[in-house]
Amino acid sequence: MFSEKLLAGRNILVTGGGTGLGKSMAARFLELGADVHICGRRKSVCDETATELMDLHGGRVTSHGVDIRNALAVDEMVEAIFKDGPLTDLVNNAAGNFISRTEDLSSRGFDAVANIVMHGTFYVTHAVGRRWIANKLRGNVVSITVTWVRNGSPYVVPSAMSKSAVHAMTMSLAAEWGRYGIRLNTIAPGEIPTEGMSKRIKPGDEAGARTKAMNPMGRVGTMEELQNLAVFLISGGCDWINGETIAMDGGQALAMGGNFYQLRDWTDTDWEKARDQIKAQNEKDRSARQ
């Protein structure tokens, strides 16, 4: 689909690049000739991913153990990257989400999502963007959001609010920074199953089962489709796309709203079971970080 070295000479940072969607996009960028930086809280995971991707595709992947909720740590990482060679592109992928009745949410639960998705995404975008402007460099930012930035979603209110903030940031900075040759766009994918996220927002379901039943195309999305859209947006194939949120969900948002309204019929027992499964996944993730 793309020429073999389409991204040669590009230097791309992918947040949350050690696993899941971020890892997949990083792999495709590397395969197409880019130098890639990945960051995440678990440095060991990012190191393993960097080694794995370079073994598969060659090239250069640099890993950074950074919590993007920490603005100072983000700025130090970006400064170090720019000293080695300025970034050309940023992919804001790091995220967090879980389902909950909003009346059951704690402030800690809300902050766990908002601090990563809203604050963290801004911190990274700001640190990269102001260096592009100071050095008179063009750049591209692609952020991963959700289809419900347009219509909201019950039962994932921290994510709906935070992703909508990223959507607003994208439109606002596209207008403000466009004159510097800096473009910002977002991809709003439907369900592309990953282990951790699937167990937090669709606990108990077979991966993709609900989407397959409700989606006009009768299936979930694929990593390859996300990779291809991300590559297109940063490739320069159409530099006049700026400030857009592109849904990639098989038409589910159009047909069904693309959100979690269907959970209105859950009983207290259903919610208790979901909480237990989410807690188990969180414990598993904490153990992996130790």
What label would you give each PLM region?
Residues L105, G152-M161, S172, M197-R200, ...:
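Active-site loop-to-helix junction immediately N-terminal to the catalytic Tyr of the SDR YXXXK motif
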Residues T125, S162, T170:
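Active-site helix of classical SDR
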Residues V91, G178, R183, I241-G243:
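Short, small/polar-rich loop/turn modules that mediate ligand/substrate recognition or access, typified
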Residues N11, G16-G20:
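Conserved glycine-rich cofactor-binding loop
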Residues R130, A175-R179, D239:
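Alpha-helical segment proximal to the catalytic Tyr-Lys
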Residues R101-T102, S106-A114, T211:
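Substrate-binding pocket helix/loop in short-chain dehydrogenase/reductase
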Residues T186, E206-I241, M248-G250, I278-Q290:
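C-terminal helical subdomain
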